[in-house]
Amino acid sequence: MAVPRNRHSNARKNIRRSHDAKKACHAAKCSNCKHALLPHTICPSCGFYNGKAVMTVEKK
């Protein structure tokens, strides 16, 4: 079984883990209703994608 020969220091461990943190998502705005949404997705409030009506949304 493989065993490390020497102990890794805390600094070396933390430098390796520096890229593991969660990144903030970049919200886009719908071109039709200006609703905040994730990029490359259909707008859940109006049903538009890329300036075109893709699906119909029933109003509550």
Swiss-Prot record:
The answer to whether keyword Cell membrane applies is no
Extract the coiled-coil ranges from the record. Answer: none
Annotated GO MF terms: structural constituent of ribosome
Compositionally biased region (Basic residues): 1-16
Region (Disordered) location: 1-20
- UniProt keyword Cell inner membrane present: no
A single GO CC term for this protein reads: large ribosomal subunit
Per its UniProt entry, which superkingdom is the organism in?
Bacteria
Keywords (alphabetical) are: Ribonucleoprotein, Ribosomal protein
Give the record's GO biological process terms.
translation
Q: Which HAMAP family match?
A: Ribosomal_bL32
Q: Which NCBIfam families match?
A: rpmF_bact (TIGR01031)
Q: Which family does the similarity line name?
A: Belongs to the bacterial ribosomal protein bL32 family.
State what protein this is by name: Large ribosomal subunit protein bL32
Species this chain originates from? Chlamydia pneumoniae (Chlamydophila pneumoniae)
Question: Which gene holds the coding sequence for this protein?
Answer: rpmF
